[in-house]
Amino acid sequence: MADPGDGPRAAPGEVAEPPGDESGTSGGEAFPLSSLANLFEGEEGSSSLSPVDASRPAGPGDGRPNLRMKFQGAFRKGVPNPIDLLESTLYESSVVPGPKKAPMDSLFDYGTYRHHPSDNKRWRRKVVEKQPQSPKAPAPQPPPILKVFNRPILFDIVSRGSTADLDGLLSFLLTHKKRLTDEEFREPSTGKTCLPKALLNLSNGRNDTIPVLLDIAERTGNMREFINSPFRDIYYRGQTSLHIAIERRCKHYVELLVAQGADVHAQARGRFFQPKDEGGYFYFGELPLSLAACTNQPHIVNYLTENPHKKADMRRQDSRGNTVLHALVAIADNTRENTKFVTKMYDLLLLKCSRLFPDSNLETVLNNDGLSPLMMAAKTGKIGVFQHIIRREVTDEDTRHLSRKFKDWAYGPVYSSLYDLSSLDTCGEEVSVLEILVYNSKIENRHEMLAVEPINELLRDKWRKFGAVSFYINVVSYLCAMVIFTLTAYYQPLEGTPPYPYRTTVDYLRLAGEVITLFTGVLFFFTSIKDLFTKKCPGVNSLFVDGSFQLLYFIYSVLVVVSAALYLAGIEAYLAVMVFALVLGWMNALYFTRGLKLTGTYSIMIQKILFKDLFRFLLVYLLFMIGYASALVTLLNPCTNMKVCDEDQSNCTVPTYPACRDSETFSAFLLDLFKLTIGMGDLEMLSSAKYPVVFILLLVTYIILTFVLLLNMLIALMGETVGQVSKESKHIWKLQWATTILDIERSFPVFLRKAFRSGEMVTVGKSSDGTPDRRWCFRVDEVNWSHWNQNLGIINEDPGKSEIYQYYGFSHTVGRLRRDRWSSVVPRVVELNKNSSADEVVVPLDNLGNPNCDGHQQGYAPKWRTDDAPL
């Protein structure tokens, strides 16, 4: 007998309808455990099936053993309503491929399932007996329904930005003691959590689920871990939500993340964030501050460096040792728009660092390669940034120590500028920018960078001080050495074996010539090794083009030393080695044609034709010769050992090439083919061919391909090379001329380098600590007819050179220097045109002259000495 307080029991022949169905059963009734127990009645025996169940065909959802296992698991896990477990199994269906997300959204496609409560509802029905309901029993309250969340559901919700679907997420996490950073909520391929997913799916710069996710993370106690959770795959390793917010240009989310404890020094080191030459796509310096700077977001840069929560340290370096200034140089591409924003951002960061860290100069920090931002710009050929750095002029007195260009005096359109030579010309103490420009052949536009002031005038000054005299002394010395070598080789004895005796005056003169030749060979050997190693040629192309003469001098010295060793050993083969050294020595005299523009351009043409056009021609021609020689020799009749005699049997000989084919025929035939190419050969071998027609046909095709085709192609290519060199002869010769100057300077000892150093020591202002700012500067007198005394921070109010000089240490032994007037003349900032747009930066890339203070190109000569002026 049933207890009146029990819930209603269904009769065996009735069907229990689920809540919310059209049966009219109240949706507020609880699911009776007795009905759940009756669901599995008669499962082991088929005799208890009702007629309704027996007549209904079995469907795919009637797997009773699986259903029993799911409900038993529900009881073990403590699910309040087992029907919820049935609904949760709907998310385990096959995943529909979603649209691709790139970049950084996902490396792989994952499925997205959107569940609608009215779709695909399936209810298990059980026939139970009808029992009258007790009108006195109150309906029990249903237990709360707990939503189930997993990665596909959560990622789909945040992608749509639906905050309503996140209801119940906090309860689910707290009930099951889970966190949003658990592995089950991460993308397996990248380790991405739902926060980066939400930031990558913004609508009009917003995603309303982001504050909700941060609130949930705070309540679950892992806010910092959730915000700073990085990507873990090799492609995007190290990237955090802060990087994504900056890349999406969302300052409000950047502020929100930083306020919640985001790491402002997180480093994104994945393959995607490497330079292009290393297989990456966008290198920005790994740090969030560098990313904001490289994407031209000054408002985010200001916030990261000045926020009250955690300030980004601008002095921080990435895994390559690069600062944010290095990163800006790395992304420069010499276009006008790119150069404009890079230079403005560069100055913003440099000035900001000076104000925040007065004792630090961000521009002097070296990376792992030992390069400052200026050196990096020179090495990578970023001419726009390079020109901006070396010509930077700051008129603000508080940050004037960051200037590299100072106006000493101005009078009308004429003004004298002082350029800071630190890092530009280091006088051998460390690697200088000038050496990087001259000896780094990977820069295609280095001849343009050498035309930027003050580099151009600095080279002219070096040539006037020591380059010209040293160069002509070297020319005379080398020619004398080669004349002595030639006379020594010409008057070698014809009889006897080496070493030859020295008896007469001529013999002693020959001995003196041999000693001088050996001495020059040893000298060239060590100097060539020094030049080849100290220049650090970056590749084979640099070695054979820029270092071609150093390589030829090295080979010449080796031949001279080997020839001397063979001579002393008594081997007559020394003569063969000596003649090669003699030829190569006279060819090396072309090196000294660099001193003159006319002959210097000619030597450059010869180098390019030898290493470019002629090399390719010889490669193809050699293949043709080997192929045709192999085929034609095969057609010749082999030689026999039978002797061929005259009619009187007096002269008997064994037949050889060209009468037949023997062991030496192939090499001799190669020489005959070369003679045919230049029109000097004959066809004596035709008589010994097995098939003369085939032989002649092959010879005709060979002559057409080599004499007609290849030779004319070589002539055309050489003409094109000569034309290209002629168009850029001036710039190319200047590069060779600069190389000659630096070669001479590097051959000097350190004390001579300092003695001939260009520039003067001047006091240009005050440093950050208030002490006099003394620098080694180079003076360039310039003229500007478009703007007159605009925004010029001048040092001296009296124009022209002073007649009073001071001496500073070692410099007084070289020459008198310009008087330091800082103690008597207070620097003034003359601002006569406050409406000039000083912020506009326009870098002329075609004609690299001196821009005026507004950045516009001048129509007149930017300096006193023009490029066409004689040296």
Curated annotation (Swiss-Prot):
UniProt note: phenotype after gene disruption: Knockout mice display impairment of the intercellular junction-dependent barrier function in the skin. Increased energy expenditure and improved insulin sensitivity in white adipose tissues is also observed. They also display reduced Ca2+ entry and loss of regulatory volume decrease in response to hypotonicity in acinar cells. The voluntary water intake normally induced by sodium concentration increase in body fluid is impaired.
Pfam families: Ank, Ion_trans
Extracellular-side segments: 491-507, 569-572, 637-665, 686-693
Biased composition (Basic and acidic residues): 116-129
Coarse class of the protein's main subcellular location: membrane
Topology feature Cytoplasmic, residues: 1-469, 535-547, 594-608, 723-871
Mapped ANK repeat ranges: 237-266, 284-313, 369-398
Region listing for Disordered, in residue ranges: 1-68, 110-143, 850-871
Catalytic activity: Ca(2+)(in) = Ca(2+)(out)
PTM annotation (Phosphoserine): residues: 824
Top-level taxon of the source organism: Eukaryota
Protein location: Cell membrane; Apical cell membrane; Cell junction, Adherens junction; Cell projection, Cilium
Any GO molecular function: SH2 domain binding
Transmembrane stretches, start-end: 470-490, 508-534, 548-568, 573-593, 609-636, 694-722
A GO-annotated cellular component: focal adhesion
InterPro entries for this protein: Ankyrin_rpt, Ankyrin_rpt-contain_sf, Ion_trans_dom, TRPV, TrpV1-4, TrpV4
Entry's family note: Belongs to the transient receptor (TC 1.A.4) family. TrpV subfamily. TRPV4 sub-subfamily.
Subunit (UniProt): Homotetramer. Interacts with calmodulin. Interacts with CTNNB1. The TRPV4 and CTNNB1 complex can interact with CDH1. Part of a complex containing MLC1, AQP4, HEPACAM and ATP1B1. Interacts with MAP7 and Src family Tyr protein kinases LYN, SRC, FYN, HCK, LCK and YES. Interacts with PACSIN1, PACSIN2 and PACSIN3 (via SH3 domain). Interacts with ITPR3. Interacts with AQP5; the interaction is probably indirect and regulates TRPV4 activation by hypotonicity. Interacts with ANO1. Interacts (via C-terminus) with PKD2 (via C-terminus).
NCBIfam families associated with the record: trp
Listed name of the protein: Transient receptor potential cation channel subfamily V member 4
Classification lineage: Eukaryota, Metazoa, Chordata, Craniata, Vertebrata
